[in-house]
Amino acid sequence: MIIGYDAKRIVNNNTGLGSYGRNLINSLVPLLETNDKLLLYTPSFGNEELRSQVIHSNQVQYVYPQNASN
């Protein structure tokens, strides 16, 4: 299964929806089956500190538009 998530708030908001999104993704990662993937769609790279709060896994991938910038 492939799950897409609008991750704009995850990489830009420290509290509120950003915190909720990071907690949601971090809660889903341990439940993923071998072939499952989480695709986190965001229009920019956002804040590295906030991106790093998401569990690093081969099954989690950020997806940016071709013209994405900091």
Describe these PLM feature segments.
Residues 1-70:
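Carbohydrate transferase catalytic cores enriched for Leloir-type hexosyltransferases
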